[in-house]
UniProtKB/Swiss-Prot annotation:
Residues 424-444, 620-648, 774-784, 792-809 have a biased composition (Polar residues). GO terms for biological process: cardiac atrium morphogenesis; cardiac muscle tissue growth; cell-cell junction organization; endothelial cell morphogenesis; heart development; in utero embryonic development; lung development; lymph circulation. The modification Phosphoserine is found at residue 1359. Residues 1-29 form the signal peptide. One of its GO terms (cellular component) is external side of plasma membrane. GO terms for molecular function: calcium ion binding. Residues 25-37 have a biased composition (Pro residues). Pfam families: EGF, EGF_CA. This is Protein HEG homolog 1. Gene3D superfamilies: Laminin.
């Protein structure tokens, strides 16, 4: 039935494949059995330009006539002449993609023609947002093989190219980053296996088959990419409503032993992915794509942003399919005659499950690809063993009784991963998410028994695609021709131009000849593409595919040296989120035995920019490497960069660093003899943080950009741990240094990860990383681990760690020449590595500082186990070559950069489906815990929504590892396992685990050492700061501020700390604001206010330096809402007599003759007076007494100045005093007041006033007294008579009431006796002159003699009338007496 999208695609879809599928004539003598139709995944029928027929096994009816997308043809479009593939070219695939059991590598080689010799030019242009794929290639001998068997191509090694990119499901069509991919190798052919298009996404799996004439290298890649969501450019929705794309990359490489210069064979198990039926209806669709590559051709790696660079749209609509990927393990062929050592890779990769429409539930499964690189130790004859995984199977059972690496049986409990709380059903009805069985890629290298050549090849196939986000991470093994081994240029990812060139001698042409990767750094959402470096044909490619849902693509870098070179193994795990910058780095350091030259290569990836520098320089792609022509290539830099963790694992050393900060481990060996690579043991889980660079090479730590590090430290995204160590690490590494991990912490949050760890029963695990609480059962195994950062270094940042900074372990073990005897069927030693610890999530607790990695208390035992042991290489004949190499002292330091594995649970999209991570411990050390968590690794998990942060736990290998002993179980399929154990004790203080200059002292404690810390530090590793301020070390007036490793005493304003005392200094401060309008022309021209501060400080120092006792000037600028506040402070010694006026004058002169920048001069000139009085008093108020003093700071010291009339005994007094009464202040001295004055300052004359008033009052009183006395003494005797006779009417007689005698009218003598009664009482009533006062007397009467002469007092007995006579009228009776007074 035709897919709903069949109408969209032009019928000639396969015309695109036509130029790539031209087959060369088979070499004479080469015979291949005809492929069985039942086993053919796809058949390439000859077509005459009209297109070719693509037959999909078991789903033929669903193939609509494919139509290619818009297509740009390159030059030399191939004509319609297309030749059918030779019978030998026919591809075979066993049932379920399994390779037939039994057989040998030789038999596998015979399936391929050996005449692929013609050169061809390939120009492939990819438009990521466009569905254009133009390929121009003249090619012959193209082989499309679907069988899981190893096939030997012609004598020319072939290059593997995996170009599988998927369009962004989230409609990220807006950014069409264009990637130009040009292949110009000579003598290579191109092969495109198949292209399958899911309904909403494009599945493009193309194999560029590049045969070369030097050696045969076969590599098959099955690429399945399923992508959910509809690509924005496609514009049509699926009929089924399901948008799903998934990509599984499986690669196989075999190398035929045609010449001694062959590259190590790389063999990756093939993946068969049967698609499950939608709605339980419709035939299943199995896709199997193989890429064959010549070993000599570089691997061209194309990383695209969310859109796929190559989109081969197959009309077949893929509904949601449950993909059970079964991985057949293929044993790499061994060189019969002195060929370079071959590396076998067994790829067990889990493809992501298909995704349901509407993204109701996206199941993301990251493939756990474990590339195990076994040093040439044991070669297993068994190639046919294969591991098959069925999503619905309860167990994951390897069909062959003898597992290829001695893994007798792999139990995969509960193969179908569980999403959320429920287990994902493996039935075909499941549309929301289909279970994916994950297999691991096991990379095994066989050392050639010739010339001591050591070749190790990393082959990591990590196809992790989430249904939600199409993150297809492809692992690209790279075959390097032995002939061009010595010339190579590091592939450089340039930040601006996403061009990576791999210089190779085999490419005689210039930059065009060098294989170039077009890495589009401008991919939307911060896509990162990383090209691994390759030295001497060491091809490291890190492909990071950004998916719309922030998935990160895990790319493994595989690189090998063959001819006389030390095998260099590097694996780069790139996981980046779309929004977060991931810095992934691949470091390969090669040193010639005769040269001390070394190169450190690093990729620092920042947001949308890829930068690769070689020795600090951008290396342009060139045919020759600038300095690396080396005969001895130190193998070791397996670098794994994870969003939060990068683990560098090597048998010699393991280095863990934060993924945010790319860690570079480079080791160069100067040993004259070819080093014996150590077997990769489960050291990947060891916390061997020691790197073994030679003494001449210093470890270069790549300091990741703060941008990159910051997002990661904050990103909760889980990080897969791809733990691969190069087995070919030379033993003759004279020095090991522990590079310090970057300063960023690894994982912000922890999350649980149920992981099933499979341990091979027959293998002795050198290091069992199985956590104590972890069980082999996948279901029961859910171990939450809290992130532990063992040590936080106080140092702020890490720039680089010189070799001498860490103690090195010297080991020398030349490769014995006996290795040259390896037979054609060497079985790779199945070194058992129980990588069970994967589940707990290895955490890279990365040192935040430049301090060397510290051993965490719980991790490795104090004694570093010797990671050495004779390696038994068994040939099929049973001859065993025992390579005993001197001990390599690798301190087992569980450093802060411990191995960290990402939490195995992946929360896909908004759904809470958790995918348990299962890791099968491969026989080699390599273990990639990278679960299809490509998306998960990236903080892209944000887009995933509920993905909890990975838990990070420092793996304590001390429990699992037998201290001081390392056992390698080397087992041949035909031989009984040989266990070689070597024990050596290593001083725990070799790497100086004590931080902050602490002294390490070895002892017999559990940790094996203790640290003598400096006074400022404490703790087991001297990582805890001591708060010195608790002991009050500062003066009483100073404030103590604790710092990391020290403290600061800060004196108040106006004081300066000198000799432990805050001394008073002359301080002039000011503060002014600059408005925004002014800032637009001056300050804002500077990117940072720090520049303004520095400029002003420089100007002030220049101005005031001429003044005496000048100390310094400080400037502080701060931004406010609409202005910038600038504070100035200038200090002088107290002995200086500088005043504020002096500073103002000097400042004015400086401004007038300003020699600073125009902005600063304008800034200072805008202020009329920079320093103003009172500024210091505002900041430092001495609390003066307002009544008696005021604050002044004119002389640079805030003092209380007394008001007039007041004085101070001390100038520092805050108040003033006045003199006492009777004193006044004269010349600052109190003087007594003059007479009569007193009070304050003698201003009160009260004494004088008192004297005057007292005298006046006394005199007055005296006068009054005298007057009174005088008055009293002066009396008049006549007063009575005067009163009586005052007037004539007044009578003093008591008889006044009686009337007068009328008869008496006159008062003469003759009339007085003539009264009425003859009484004389009336005499008293007379008012005549007789008794009148003297003053009243009439003078005339006196002259006439009328007045009598008697003037006696009245009341007397004497009569007034008759003076001198007795008065008869006087009555003495008291009763009648009347007092007249």
């Amino acid at each position: 039935m035709a897919s709903p999208r069949a109408s969209r695609w032009p019928p000639p879809l396969l015309l695109l494949l036509l130029p790539l599928l031209l087959l060369p004539p088979a070499a004479p003598g080469t015979r291949d059995p005809p492929p069985s139709p039942a086993r053919r995944a796809l058949s390439l029928a000859p077509l005459a330009g009209a297109g070719l027929e693509l037959q999909l096994e078991r789903r033929p009816e669903r193939e609509p006539p494919p139509t290619p997308p818009r297509e740009r043809r390159g030059p030399a479009t191939p004509g319609p002449s297309y030749r059918a593939p030779e019978p030998g070219a026919a591809t075979q695939r066993g049932p379920s993609g399994r390779a037939p059991r039994g057989g040998s590598a030789d038999a596998a080689w015979k399936h391929w023609p050996e005449s692929n010799t013609e050169a061809h030019v390939e120009n492939i242009t990819f438009y990521q947002n466009q569905e254009d794929f133009s390929t121009v290639s003249s090619k012959e001998g193209v082989m499309v093989q679907t069988s899981g068997k190893s096939h030997a191509a012609s004598d020319a090694p072939e290059n593997l190219t995996l170009l599988a990119e998927t369009a962004d499901a989230r409609g990220r069509s807006g950014s069409s980053s264009r990637t130009n991919f040009t292949i110009l190798p000579v003598g290579y052919s191109l092969e495109i296996a198949t292209a399958l298009t899911s309904q909403s996404g494009n599945l493009a799996s193309e194999s560029l088959h590049l045969p070369s004439s030097s050696s045969e290298f076969d590599e098959r890649i099955a690429a399945f990419q399923t992508k959910s969501g509809t690509a924005s450019e496609m514009g049509t929705e699926r009929a089924m409503g399901l948008s799903e794309e998934w990509t599984v990359h499986s690669q196989e490489a075999t190398t035929s032993a045609w010449s001694p210069s062959f590259l190590p064979a790389l063999e990756m198990g093939e993946l068969t992915t049967p698609s499950r039926k939608r709605n339980s209806s419709g035939p299943d669709l199995s896709w199997l794509h193989f890429y064959r590559t010549a070993a000599s051709s570089p691997l061209l790696d194309l990383s695209s942003s969310s859109e796929s660079t190559e989109k081969l749209n197959n009309s077949t609509g893929l509904q949601s399919s449950s993909v059970s990927q079964t991985k057949t393990m293929h044993v790499a062929t061994v060189f019969t005659d002195g060929g370079p050592r071959t590396l076998r890779s067994l790829t067990v990769s889990l493809g992501p499950v298909s995704k349901t429409e509407g993204f109701p539930k996206d199941s993301r499964i990251a493939t756990t690809s474990s590339s195990v690189l076994l040093s040439p130790s044991a070669v297993e004859s068994r190639r046919n063993s294969r591991v098959t995984g069925n999503p619905g199977d309860e167990e994951f059972i390897e069909p062959s009784t003898e597992n290829e690496f001695g893994l007798t049986s792999l139990r995969w409990q509960n193969d179908s991963p569980t999403f959320g709380e429920h287990q994902l059903a493996s039935s075909s009805e499941v549309q929301n998410g289909s279970p994916m069985s994950q297999t691991e890629t096991v990379s095994r290298s066989v050392a050639p028994m010739r010339g001591g050549e050591i070749t190790a090849h990393w082959l990591l196939t990590n196809s992790t695609t989430s249904a939600d986000v199409t993150g297809s991470s492809a692992s690209y093994p790279e075959g390097v021709n032995a002939s061009v081994l010595t010339q190579f240029s590091d592939s450089t990812v340039q930040s601006g131009g996403s061009h990576t060139a791999l210089g190779d001698r085999s490419y005689s042409e210039s930059s065009s000849t060098s294989s170039s990767e077009s890495l589009n750094s401008s991919a939307p959402r911060g896509e990162r593409s990383i090209a691994g470096i390759s030295y001497g044909q060491v091809r490291g490619t890190a492909i990071e595919q950004r998916t719309s849902s922030d998935h990160t693509d895990h790319t493994y870098l595989s690189s090998t040296f063959t001819k006389g070179e030390r095998a260099l193994l590097s694996i780069t795990d790139n996981s980046s989120s779309s929004d977060i910058v991931e810095s992934s780095t691949s470091y390969i350091k090669i040193s010639n035995s005769s040269h001390s030259e070394y190169s450190s290569f690093f990729h620092a990836q920042t947001e949308r920019s890829n930068i690769s520098s070689y020795d600090g320089e951008y290396a342009q792609p060139s045919t020759e490497s600038p300095v690396l022509h080396t005969s001895n290539l130190p193998s070791y830099t397996p670098t794994i960069n994870m969003p939060n963790t990068s683990v560098v694992l090597d048998t010699d050393a393991e280095f863990v660093s934060d993924s945010s900060s790319s860690s570079s481990s480079s080791s160069s060996s100067s040993s004259s003899g070819p080093p014996l690579p150590l077997p990769s043991v489960s050291q990947s889980h060891h916390l061997f943080s020691s790197i073994l660079p030679s003494t001449r090479a210093s470890v270069h730590l790549l300091k990741s950009t703060s941008d990159a590090s910051t997002p990661w430290s904050s990103s909760p995204s889980p990080l897969p741990v791809s733990l691969t160590t190069s087995t070919s690490a030379p033993l003759s590494v004279s020095q090991t240094t522990l590079p310090q991990s970057s300063s960023t912490p690894v994982l912000p949050r922890a999350r649980e990860t149920p992981v099933t760890s499979f341990q091979t029963s027959t293998m002795t695990s050198f290091m069992t990383m199985l956590h104590s609480s972890q069980t082999a059962d996948l279901k029961s195994q859910s171990t939450p681990h809290q992130e532990k950062v063992i040590t936080e270094s106080k140092s702020p940042s890490l720039v680089s760690l010189p070799t001498e900074s860490t103690k090195a372990v010297t080991t020398n073990s030349p490769l014995p020449p006996s290795l040259t005897e390896s037979s054609t069927e060497q079985t790779l030693p199945a070194t058992s590595t129980n990588l069970a610890q994967m589940s707990p999530t290895f955490t890279t607790t990365i040192l935040k500082t430049s301090q060397p990695l510290m051993t965490t208390p719980g991790t490795l035992s104090s004694t570093a186990s010797l990671v050495t042991g004779p390696i038994a290489v068994q040939t099929t004949a049973g001859k065993q070559l025992s390579l005993t190499h001197p001990e390599i002292l690798v301190p087992q330091i569980s450093t802060e950069g411990g191995i960290s594995t990402e939490r195995n649970r992946v929360i896909v999209d908004a759904t809470t489906g958790l995918i348990p991570l299962t890791s099968v411990p491969t026989s080699a050390k390599e273990m990639t815990t990278k679960l299809g968590v490509t998306a998960e690794y990236s903080p892209a998990s944000r887009s995933l929504g509920t993905s909890p942060s990975p838990q990070t736990t420092v793996v304590s290998t001390a429990e699992d590892l037998a201290p001081k002993s390392a056992t390698f179980a080397v087992q041949s399929s035909t031989q009984s396992p040989t266990t070689v154990s070597s024990s050596a004790s290593v001083n725990s203080c070799a790497v100086n685990p004590c931080l902050h200059n602490g002294e390490c002292v070895a002892d017999n404690t559990s940790r094996g050492y203790h640290c003598r810390c400096p006074p400022s530090w404490q703790g087991d590793d001297c990582s805890v700061d001591v708060n010195e301020c608790l002991s009050n070390p500062c003066p009483s007036t100073a404030m103590c501020n604790n710092t990391q490793g020290s403290f600061i005493c800060k004196c108040p304003v106006g004081y300066q700390l000198e000799k432990g005392i805050c001394n008073l200094v002359r301080t002039f401060v000011t503060e002014f604001k600059l408005k925004r309008t002014f800032l637009n022309t001056t300050v804002e021209k500077h990117s940072d206010l720090q520049e303004v501060e520095n400029e002003i400080t420089k100007t002030l120092n220049m101005c005031f330096s001429a003044l005496p006792s000048y100390i310094r000037s400080t400037v502080h600028a701060s931004r406010e809402s609409n202005a910038v506040v600038i504070s100035l402070q200038t200090t002088f010694s107290l002995a200086s007599n500088v005043t504020l006026f002096d500073l103002a004058d000097r400042m004015q002169k400086c401004v007038n003759s300003c020699k600073s920048s125009a902005e600063v001069c304008q800034l200072l000139g805008s202020q009329r007076r920079i320093f103003r009085a009172g500024s210091l008093c505002k900041r430092k108020s001495p609390e003066c007494d307002k009544d008696t003093s005021i604050c002044t700071d004119l002389d640079g010291v805030a003092l209380c100045q007394c008001k007039s009339g007041y004085f101070q005994f001390n100038k520092m007094d805050h108040s003033c005093r006045a003199c006492e009464d009777g004193y006044r202040l004269e010349n600052e001295t109190c003087m007594s007041c003059p007479f009569g004055l007193g009070g304050l300052n003698c201003g009160n004359p009260y004494q004088l006033i008192t004297v005057v008033i007292a005298a006046a009052g006394g005199g007055l009183l005296l006068i009054l007294g005298i007057a009174l006395i005088v008055t009293c003494c002066r009396k008049n005797k006549n007063d009575i008579s005067k009163l009586i006779f005052k007037s004539g009417d007044f009578q003093m007689s008591p008889y006044a009431e009686y009337p007068k005698n009328p008869r008496s009218q006159e008062w003469g003598r003759e009339a007085i006796e003539m009264h009425e009664n003859g009484s004389t009482k009336n005499l008293l009533q007379m008012t005549d002159v007789y008794y009148s006062p003297t003053s009243v007397r009439n003078p005339e009467l006196e002259r006439n003699g009328l007045y009598p002469a008697y003037t006696g007092l009245p009341g007397s007995r004497h009569s007034c009338i008759f003076p001198g006579q007795y008065n008869p009228s006087f009555i003495s009776d008291e009763s009648r007496r009347r007092d007249y007074f």
